[in-house]
């Protein structure tokens, strides 16, 4: 958080640094240095929606589903348990660096195993907090694997190898 605070203050400090550089005293007998180039604003950061895009692969066979509300999360979880469906729940957050690192792996797995839906759940979504503590989600990324309506596996952290092997095991059970 301190880094973000420092980064937020950076644009306010840049004009001060430019003014200090421009106010250097003139020394006779020495050529004046060329004036610094005008300050330009940094390029904008990509939008969070682009960083966490869940657009299906070009073949259109992705099984990634973004859970949009606490109500839909509860509904999906109930359906998976009641109908004994295979599923993966991917608990993530937009501010999570390891989650961003795992995004391409998850995208690849959702295309490789289209019969296993992957439900992407943002832990910062309103109304989800109590459900997450009931499920013992304490860090992200966390992946829960369901088979025949019950949780059969869990991967915590950005461990691509373990994630792929657990997904393969779930696929073999189908």
Swiss-Prot record:
Mark out the transit peptide.
Answer: 1-59
Q: Which GO terms describe its cellular component?
A: mitochondrion
Q: Which UniProt keywords apply?
A: Disulfide bond, Electron transport, Mitochondrion, Redox-active center, Transit peptide, Transport
Query: What are the residue boundaries of the Thioredoxin domain, all occurrences included?
Result: 60-172
Among Pfam families, the record links this protein to: Thioredoxin (PF00085)
> Which CDD domains is this protein grouped with?
TRX_family
| InterPro entries assigned | Thioredoxin-like_sf, Thioredoxin_domain
Among SUPFAM superfamilies, the record links this protein to: Thioredoxin-like
Residues at the site labelled Contributes to redox potential value = 97-98
Kindly list the cysteine pairs connected by disulfide bridges: 96-99
Where along the chain is the active site annotated? 96 (nucleophile), 99 (nucleophile)
Q: Where in the cell is it found?
A: Mitochondrion
**Protein origin, superkingdom:** Eukaryota
The protein's role, per its UniProt record: Probable thiol-disulfide oxidoreductase that may participate in various redox reactions.
- Recorded family membership: Belongs to the thioredoxin family. Plant O-type subfamily.
What is this protein's record name?
A: Thioredoxin O, mitochondrial
Species name for this entry?
Oryza sativa subsp. japonica (Rice)
């Amino acid at each position: 958080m301190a880094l973000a605070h420092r980064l937020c203050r950076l644009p306010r400090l840049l004009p001060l640094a430019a003014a200090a550089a421009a106010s250097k005293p003139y020394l006779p007998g020495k050529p004046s240095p060329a004036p610094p180039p005008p300050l330009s604003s940094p390029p904008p950061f990509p939008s969070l929606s682009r960083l966490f895009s869940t657009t299906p692969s070009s073949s259109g066979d992705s099984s990634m589903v973004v859970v949009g509300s606490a109500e839909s999360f509860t509904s999906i979880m109930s359906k998976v348990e009641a109908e004994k469906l295979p599923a993966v729940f991917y608990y993530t957050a937009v501010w999570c660096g390891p989650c961003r690192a795992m995004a391409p792996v998850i995208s690849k797995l959702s295309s490789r195993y289209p019969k296993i839906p992957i439900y992407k759940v943002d832990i910062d979504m309103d109304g989800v907090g109590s459900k997450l503590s009931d499920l013992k989600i304490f860090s992200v990324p966390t992946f829960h694997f369901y088979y025949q309506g019950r949780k059969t596996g869990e991967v915590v952290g950005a461990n691509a190898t373990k994630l792929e092997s657990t997904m393969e095991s779930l696929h073999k059970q189908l």
